[in-house]
C-alpha cells in the first residue's frame, strides 16, 4: 500500500528517509555524499514521484522503493 508522504509530519518523514538511507548504504560513486545530501536526494525523488513510501502488510514494514517496482495494483511485489 502506498503511503502519501505529503500527509506525514515533516519530522516523521525525515526520520523515515534517514533510516532508509542508513539501511540501504547506497553507493553514490567516487564522491562520498553527506547524510543530509542523501536525505535530500530521496526527498526530491519522493516529490517527483520517482520513488514512493510503501507499507507492507505482510511484513509490517515501511520502505521506500522505485514506483516502477510496484505491481499493477500499486502494491509492492512481496
UniProtKB/Swiss-Prot annotation:
One matching Pfam family is UPF0270
Residue ranges the record marks as coiled coil: none
Instruction: Spell out the family assignment given in the record's similarity comment.
Output: Belongs to the UPF0270 family.
Q: NCBIfam families annotated for this entry? A: PRK04966.1
Q: Would you tell me the protein name for this molecule? A: UPF0270 protein ECA4061
Q: Which organism is it from?
A: Pectobacterium atrosepticum (strain SCRI 1043 / ATCC BAA-672) (Erwinia carotovora subsp. atroseptica)
Amino acid at each position: 500500500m502506498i503511503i502519501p508522504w505529503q500527509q506525514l509530519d515533516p519530522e516523521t518523514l525525515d526520520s523515515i528517509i534517514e533510516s532508509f538511507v542508513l539501511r540501504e548504504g547506497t553507493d553514490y560513486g567516487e564522491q562520498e555524499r553527506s547524510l543530509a545530501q542523501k536525505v535530500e536526494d530521496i526527498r526530491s525523488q519522493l516529490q517527483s514521484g520517482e520513488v514512493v513510501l510503501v507499507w507492507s502488510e505482510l511484513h509490517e514494514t515501511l520502505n521506500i522503493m522505485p514506483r516502477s517496482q510496484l505491481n499493477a495494483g500499486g502494491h509492492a511485489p512481496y
